[in-house]
Amino acid sequence: MSLRAVPGYFAAYPSEGFQGLDSTKYDHLELINHKNWKELYHAIPRNTKNRHYKLLILARHGQGYHNAAILRYGMEKWDAYWSLLSGDEHGEWLDSKLTPLGKDQVRRTGSNVLLPMAKQLGMLPHVFFSSPMRRCLETFIESWTPVLAETQELPAGTKISTRIIEGLRETLGSHTCDKRVAHSMAVDEYQDFSTESGHTVHWQYVPDYPEDDELWLPDHRETCAEMDKRTLNGLFELFNQLSSEEKFISLTCHSGVIQSVLRNLQHPPIYNLDTGKVVAVVVEVPVNTADRGRL
């Protein structure tokens, strides 16, 4: 058995054989068979001896300085020249942070998508995960702050733990925007971050998390097949951490990761997913995932 998406919940995957949709033309997050998130959640299949079911929320980071540069220079010049540099006069994009527009995008997503979702479900995700890249750390903070501010069960000062998965990063190699800064630099800037809602975000890293980026190479851009293998290992790492009761899961990541996750889950493609947008998938997880090991 392998991981797979379950159809029939969202417009992005209404039925088997669906060929995908353009998210700029259609609402990929539309609930197609349920009135609200609570009804949808209760319609997710019950766990069995061999299979568990999860509601996985995949959030793309907001606009980073590298995204702004692509719009400014065009993809051809970006790939050929600018992506190999660390920035320009408008900003630095090595392990890019969010632009002001990017922060606005994910705040709107928090208020318009995540908050109604959490209110209808009557809960926050059971477990939060994130890519280690700075644009994702900032996206998590900015997008979930409006939700935390409305969550009365979590008084100010509550610590929100978010687990970092190193393997669920954007396409590796060559482009400096996808090179991670030193771990100590990210920790100094973001660890135990105090949100505007008065909560504290604590990032959970694996023991012996590497100080320097050991995955990114300057002279090799990861292929689609290589990325899919890495992403699948990252998904195994994620699901192996969950109990059977932890069903509502959040992952803050990248467009490339989301597309790779969808391929690994045999989910139809979602084209042109904009920065700051969210994809939701019901996932069937083999109970023996932990026994599969790494690929």
From Swiss-Prot:
<dbReference type="InterPro" id="IPR050275">
    <property type="entry name" value="PGM_Phosphatase"/>
</dbReference>
<feature type="site" description="Transition state stabilizer">
    <location>
        <position position="254"/>
    </location>
</feature>
<dbReference type="GO" id="GO:0005634">
    <property type="term" value="C:nucleus"/>
</dbReference>
<feature type="active site" description="Tele-phosphohistidine intermediate">
    <location>
        <position position="61"/>
    </location>
</feature>
<feature type="active site" description="Proton donor/acceptor">
    <location>
        <position position="170"/>
    </location>
</feature>
<keyword id="KW-0413">Isomerase</keyword>
<dbReference type="GO" id="GO:0016853">
    <property type="term" value="F:isomerase activity"/>
</dbReference>
<dbReference type="GO" id="GO:0005777">
    <property type="term" value="C:peroxisome"/>
</dbReference>
<dbReference type="GO" id="GO:0005737">
    <property type="term" value="C:cytoplasm"/>
</dbReference>
<comment type="similarity">
    <text>Belongs to the phosphoglycerate mutase family.</text>
</comment>
<dbReference type="Pfam" id="PF00300">
    <property type="entry name" value="His_Phos_1"/>
</dbReference>
<protein>
    <recommendedName>
        <fullName>Probable phosphoglycerate mutase PMU1</fullName>
        <ecNumber>5.4.-.-</ecNumber>
    </recommendedName>
</protein>
<dbReference type="GO" id="GO:0016791">
    <property type="term" value="F:phosphatase activity"/>
</dbReference>
<comment type="function">
    <text>Probable phosphomutase that may have a function related to the manipulation of phosphate groups on carbohydrates. Reduces trehalose-6-phosphate levels when overexpressed in TPS2-deleted cells. Reduces 5'-Phosphoribosyl-4-carboxamide-5-aminoimidazole (AICAR) levels, a metabolic intermediate at the crossroads between AMP and histidine biosynthesis pathways, when overexpressed in a ADE3-ADE16-ADE17 triple deletant.</text>
</comment>
<dbReference type="InterPro" id="IPR029033">
    <property type="entry name" value="His_PPase_superfam"/>
</dbReference>
<keyword id="KW-0539">Nucleus</keyword>
<dbReference type="InterPro" id="IPR013078">
    <property type="entry name" value="His_Pase_superF_clade-1"/>
</dbReference>
<keyword id="KW-0963">Cytoplasm</keyword>
